[in-house]
Amino acid sequence: MNATNDSKDINITRIYDAPLKAVWDAWTDPAQVAQWWGPRGFSLTTHSKDLRSGGHWHYTMHGPDGTDYPNRTDYLEVAPQSRLVYDHGANDDRPPMFRVTVEFTEVNGKTHMEMCMSLPSVEAAADARKFIKQAGGDATWDRLAEYLAMRVSNEDKFYINRSFEAP
């Protein structure tokens, strides 16, 4: 996580040892997102996901203490396997907390992810940095890397199951 303390933006850059399509699918397929989104100890239930400009993702984060956190993401731009722009942290009772821009590029079979979280003020960004640190820092992005490593390694496996009756 990079940013100066006088910035309202928080920038995150990661390189994933996985092809672009695998990273994009992990971000956009509700079943895959549930495997890695959020801090360690949290789980996720997607209620609906309309991945298009003007679409919404309704989901609930389930905390390790049993607390539920209803969320809504509002998609502003969806460029398949390239870019997502969305407003994050809304629910039925509150407006979005910040805007996120994520760009994906593939270089030599690895995927570069550039993310910028734009908060409404320097103070809001400072509060977000503090919250992210308390919630485990970059744990979400580490979980994505772990999920992709497992997923990509399993794609190379081929299983044959056969049963027969022996005399």
Enumerate the language-model features and the residues they cover:
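Hydrophobic ligand-binding cavity/cleft-lining segments
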Residues: M1-S43, A166-P167
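A generic structural micro-feature
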Residues: T4-D6, K49-L51, D65-Y69, D92-P96, ...
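Intrinsic-disorder/low-complexity, polar/charged segments enriched in Ser/Thr/Lys/Arg/Asp/Glu/Gln
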Residues: S7-T13, L20, H56, P70, ...
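A short, structured loop/turn motif at beta-sheet edges
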Residues: L20-K21, L51-R52, L76-S82, E103-H112
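Hydrophobic pocket/interface hotspot
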Residues: V23, V33, W57-Y59, Y75, ...
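Glycine-rich portal/gate segments that line the openings of hydrophobic small-molecule binding cavities
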Residues: T45-D87
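Beta-strand/loop substructures that line and gate deep hydrophobic ligand-binding cavities in soluble
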Residues: V85, A90-D138
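A conserved amphipathic terminal alpha-helix motif
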Residues: L119-P167
